C-alpha cells in the first residue's frame, strides 16, 4: 500500500462538478492499493499517518501530529501510484489491486484513520474521475510505502 501525503491548508475533490469531499488544515492523502495488500497494511499505514508529526509548533519545528492541530484528512484512491515505469513509455499498472479488492481496503483505511483519533475523514469516490484541488502547506509532501514499514 502506498500513500502520498500532502500537508494542506485547504483541499477538495469534485466528481461531475460537485464537491464530494473538502477539508481545511490537514492531509490530502493519495492512496494506492497494491496486489497482496491486506487490512494489516491498512492498519499500519493509518496508525503511521495519524501519528506523523509534520505540523509546526510554536518554535517552527515539525513536532505536531494531525490531532494536535485539530486537522482533517481527505483520502483519494489513486491506482496510478502503483505504476511501473521501468520499461517503455507507457506505465504498467499490473501491481495495482483489482477494484473488488482495492475498494474495500480503501474504505477500511479511511475507517482506521478515524479510529486512530482523526475526527474528520473526507473521501473521494472510488474509481470515479475526480478533480482534486489543494493548497499545499510548506510544501510538505511525504511518500509512505507499507513495504518500508516494520509491521
Predicted regions and their residues:
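Compact, glycine-rich, soluble single-domain proteins
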Residues: 18-70, 81-95, 99-111, 116, ...
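A short, glycine/Asx- and small/polar-enriched loop/turn
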Residues: 71, 134-138
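Short, low-complexity, polybasic intrinsically disordered segments
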Residues: 94-96, 137-151
Amino acid at each position: 500500500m502506498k500513500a502520498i501525503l500532502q500537508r494542506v491548508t485547504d483541499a477538495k475533490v469534485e466528481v461531475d462538478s460537485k464537491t464530494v469531499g473538502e477539508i481545511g488544515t490537514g492531509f490530502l492523502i493519495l492512496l494506492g492499493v497494491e496486489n497482496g495488500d491486506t487490512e494489516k497494511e491498512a492498519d499500519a499505514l493509518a496508525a503511521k499517518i495519524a501519528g506523523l508529526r509534520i505540523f509546526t509548533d510554536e518554535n517552527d519545528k515539525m513536532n505536531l501530529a494531525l490531532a494536535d492541530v485539530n486537522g482533517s484528512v481527505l483520502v483519494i484512491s489513486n491506482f496510478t501510484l502503483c505504476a511501473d515505469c521501468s520499461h517503455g513509455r507507457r506505465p504498467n499498472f499490473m501491481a495495482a489491486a483489482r477494484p473488488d479488492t482495492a475498494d474495500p481496503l480503501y474504505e477500511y483505511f479511511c475507517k482506521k484513520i478515524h479510529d486512530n483519533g482523526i475526527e474528520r475523514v473526507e473521501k473521494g469516490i472510488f474509481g470515479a474521475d475526480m478533480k482534486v484541488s489543494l493548497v499545499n502547506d510548506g510544501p510538505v509532501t511525504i511518500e509512505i510505502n507499507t513495504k518500508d514499514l516494520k509491521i
